[in-house]
Design a protein with these regions (language model features):
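Conserved alpha/beta enzyme-core scaffold
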Residues: 12-228
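Conserved small/polar residues in nucleotide/adenosyl-binding loops
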Residues: 1-5, 162
Length: 228
């Protein structure tokens, strides 16, 4: 991962606190949060969001984690209006609020969810997929026939804010993820108007080998680094 430091003077990303990051998330916003059952999630920022009391959020997430972990804390606190998600089974708060009508759930198969986020980041009009044909996933969606085969048109997803969790970053905002903590983070970094990365370790620009970077700093607006 590491290489010899460069002496080139690069643009430095602004470091902010978790509370400052949470303050950029306003009531009613659409927010992407990286993570897979909490792995790779920006936990300090999520804690700050819980403290802030922000509400009526729409979350775009792979899963709703657990009531006491990851984005599930926001659902447990009833700060979320809608979730676009592939799995909710590990968080009973999600299903309880769904069944009571307090929380709107838009289920999306995991691979399709990833492609919709990727499409949003790439500026595409959507993605064609056979996944979900003939199921409730297809309800209300356009079916397009290509060479005699039907596909669902899944529209792109974008967010007001993306909150990422990274293992390592340099001061230019280049991000590295350890193992499966990568999950949805790199895709989400491309598909939001404002991107904030919470990083476990911060190094000087030039300390990360270019081939190790999974999210280039050009996508990152702010970083939340561990307190020293």
């Amino acid at each position: 991962v590491y290489k010899r430091q460069s002496k080139i003077n690069h643009h430095m990303k602004k470091l902010i606190s978790a509370a400052e990051a949470a303050g950029m998330v306003k009531d009613g916003m659409t927010v992407m949060i990286g993570g897979f059952l909490g792995n790779g999630s920006p936990h300090a920022i999520i804690d700050a969001l819980v403290e802030s009391g922000v509400k009526d959020l729409t979350l775009i997430v792979n899963d709703t984690a657990y009531p006491d972990k990851g984005c599930g804390r926001l659902i447990a606190g009833k700060q979320v209006r809608k979730v676009i998600v592939s799995h909710i089974g590990t968080n009973p708060c999600t299903s309880e609020q769904m069944n009571s009508g307090e929380l709107e759930i838009e289920f999306c198969p995991q691979g399709t969810l990833a492609e919709r986020v990727r499409s949003g980041g790439a500026g595409l009009g959507g993605v064609l997929t056979p996944v979900g044909l003939g199921t409730i996933v297809a309800e209300g969606k356009q079916i397009i026939n290509v060479d005699g085969k039907d596909y669902l048109l899944e529209k792109p997803l974008r967010a007001d804010v993306a909150l990422l969790g990274a293992s390592l970053a340099d001061r230019s905002g280049n991000l590295v993820y350890k193992g499966t903590s990568q999950n949805f983070n790199p895709l989400m970094a491309t598909a939001a108007d404002l991107v904030i990365a919470e990083v476990r370790e911060l190094v000087e620009t030039g300390a990360i080998a270019p081939e190790a970077v999974r999210t280039p700093g050009i996508f990152v607006d702010y970083m939340v680094a561990p307190a020293k």
